[in-house]
């Protein structure tokens, strides 16, 4: 088994995991699988994280001054795009580009197993919520197998190019038993799985840190997957945010 982060550099992180788990290598593809263009600004909590090299991860606005993302997306500083639909749009109406210099990983984040894969990023200024920029509540109830949830992101397409427009895909939550069976020995209770259906719908590299929304709440963050994306019977892994509500609230209140 090879597990890879859902970042553009997921292959490199996957190779690190091979050394730990003794897993065999397999090919990696990079995209949201079998998705479609989201309706413009239908996911107003979606954030895009940029470094000097360009877009590298997604995030989620959970407070006017705080964005959640995957811990493996950590950088020293960020430009955070909010209210974006078209990544290539120049000054898209209703969007903001904000600097952020403070990010706090969960103290128990485990690289390379991806346990507790979340961090909070504090924007240098608060945003005023609008039709295009709006925070989303973090789920307090854990996901139920069979729930239909929506994942969104700008991960690479089948042709290897990044999409201009935000992509959306509906996935079904897998059982804990299935997730544990497929991802041992790196499986952890901070994770849940979704996807893996015969329709081959999936998240993939480039989608890391982005939202999976169930029942109008932020249920999780795109974290990692196993080998090639979109394999029937192989769901991807998401950070299980219902386990972290107290930590999230404490960090926001004390920083």
From Swiss-Prot:
Residues annotated as glycosylated: 124, 170
The annotated consequence of gene deletion is: Viable and fertile, when reared on a soft diet. Tooth morphology is grossly normal but the enamel surface is fragile and rapidly abraded. Although formation of the enamel layer is initially normal, the crystallites fail to thicken and interlock. The enamel proteins enamelin and amelogenin are not cleared and persist in the matrix during the maturation stage.
Instruction: State its location(s).
Output: Secreted
Q: Does the keyword Secreted apply?
A: yes
| Mod. after translation | N-glycosylated. The N-glycan structures are of complex diantennary or triantennary type, which may be further modified with up to 2 sialic acid residues.
The positions flagged as active site in the entry are 72 (charge relay system), 117 (charge relay system), 208 (charge relay system)
EC number in record: 3.4.21.-
InterPro entries, A to Z? Peptidase_S1_PA, Peptidase_S1_PA_chymotrypsin, Peptidase_S1A, Trypsin_dom, TRYPSIN_HIS, TRYPSIN_SER
| Positions that bind Zn(2+) | 41, 92
Q: What pairs make up the disulfide bonds? A: 57-73, 149-214, 179-193, 204-229
Stated family? Belongs to the peptidase S1 family. Kallikrein subfamily.
List, alphabetically, the PANTHER family matched. KALLIKREIN-4 (PTHR24271:SF65), KALLIKREIN-RELATED (PTHR24271)
Descriptive protein name: Kallikrein-4
């Amino acid at each position: 088994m090879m597990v890879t982060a859902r970042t553009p550099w997921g292959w490199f992180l996957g190779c690190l995991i091979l050394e730990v788990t003794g897993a065999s290598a397999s090919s990696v593809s990079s995209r949201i699988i079998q998705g479609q263009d989201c309706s413009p600004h239908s996911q107003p909590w979606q954030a895009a994280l940029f470094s000097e090299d360009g877009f590298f991860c997604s995030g989620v606005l959970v407070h006017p001054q705080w964005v959640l993302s995957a811990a493996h997306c950590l950088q020293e500083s960020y430009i955070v795009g909010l209210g974006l639909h078209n990544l290539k749009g120049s000054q898209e109406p209703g969007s903001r580009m904000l600097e952020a210099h403070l990010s706090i990983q969960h103290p128990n984040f485990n690289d390379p197993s991806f346990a507790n894969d979340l961090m909070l990023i504090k924007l240098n200024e608060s945003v005023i919520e609008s039709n295009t920029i709006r925070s989303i509540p973090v789920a307090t109830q854990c996901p139920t197998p069979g729930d239909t949830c929506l994942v969104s992101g700008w991960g690479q397409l089948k042709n290897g190019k990044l999409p201009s427009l935000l992509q959306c895909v509906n996935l079904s939550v897998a059982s804990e038993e299935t997730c544990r069976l497929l991802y041992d020995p790196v499986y952890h209770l901070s994770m849940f799985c979704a996807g893996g259906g015969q329709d081959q719908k999936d998240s993939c590299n480039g989608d890391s840190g982005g939202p999976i929304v169930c029942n109008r709440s932020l249920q999780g963050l795109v974290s990692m997957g196993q080998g090639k994306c979109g394999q029937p019977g192989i769901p991807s892994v998401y950070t299980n945010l219902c386990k972290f509500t107290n930590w999230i609230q404490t960090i926001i209140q004390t920083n």
